[in-house]
Regions:
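Metal-cofactor-dependent catalytic cores
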Residues: 1-249
Length: 249
């Protein structure tokens, strides 16, 4: 059975991994997530491990760098420049930007472009605004939704925090004609990124502590794209649970 669970409240993409994101009114959803999302990342030249990407977990001020587009980019919705916290705009693939970030990090970095995206888990992350509000209440503050770095913020029909946990294993469809489909795969295990204020870069441990205390360190869900299509703010969202397994006679 398919039921309407809410609508798209906001859409976000993060062109450069761990840098500032951008809110968009609509976006194309492809097999590798939102067009232009996390296609770029800084590679740490001194890291030979399986996850060589520089993130705000290692350089918190990285979230204060803001990708910009100044004319045609390399392709799709990729940025052409990055604005530093001091307001200087540097070419996204220029040596000056790599040198600046490497200086702050303390070792050399190199900008990399991966067409399939650079994701920690799955290509799409979702959270409901009710969940964000509840975490804020538990943490004693009003956290900016950007702390959670979702691609899709959902305004649910019911005021039930953590309702998205119940969608794991099912499918969300977007729009009256099911333009796009996302299979919800698992809950989103959180890291220290949620402690960083996206406006100032200042850390506060209360948000992560609240998530650990009441939700086993999980808030929001991940999904994979099962049908490409267009997403737009205001689009209705429908949920269909996975079919119950049949018992053998």
């Amino acid at each position: 059975m398919t039921i309407e669970v809410g609508e798209v409240e906001a859409l976000f993409r993060y062109p450069v991994k761990s840098m500032g994101g951008e809110a968009v009114e609509e976006a194309e959803l492809g097999w590798h997530g939102l067009d232009g999302d996390r296609r770029l990342a800084f590679h740490r030249a001194d890291d030979r491990g399986g996850f060589p990407w520089l993130t705000a977990g290692k350089l918190p001020e990285l979230i204060l760098f803001a990708p910009q587009r100044r004319g045609p980019g390399v392709g799709g919705n990729l940025p052409t420049h990055v604005r530093t916290p001091e307001g200087k705009e540097l070419a996204v693939f220029g040596q000056e930007l790599a040198t600046e970030v490497g200086r702050r990090h303390g070792s050399p970095v190199e900008m990399m472009h991966l067409n399939r995206g650079i994701f920690d888990e799955a290509s799409v992350s979702l959270i409901t605004s009710v969940t964000v509000d509840e975490i804020g209440r538990l943490a004693g503050q009003r956290p900016d939704v950007r702390r959670f770095r979702p691609n899709i913020l959902i305004a649910t029909s019911r005021s039930v925090p953590f309702e998205e946990d119940d969608w794991v294993g099912g499918v969300l469809s977007f729009g009256e004609t099911s333009e796009a489909l996302i299979g919800i795969t698992n809950r989103d295990e959180r890291c220290s990124m949620v402690n960083l204020d996206p406006g100032s870069g200042r850390p506060s441990a209360e948000v992560l502590k609240a998530i650990v205390r009441v939700r086993d360190n999980r808030a929001g869900v991940y999904g994979t794209v099962t049908r490409r299509g267009r997403l737009a703010v205001g689009q209705p969202i429908f949920f269909e649970a996975a079919p119950e397994p049949r018992e053998r006679p």
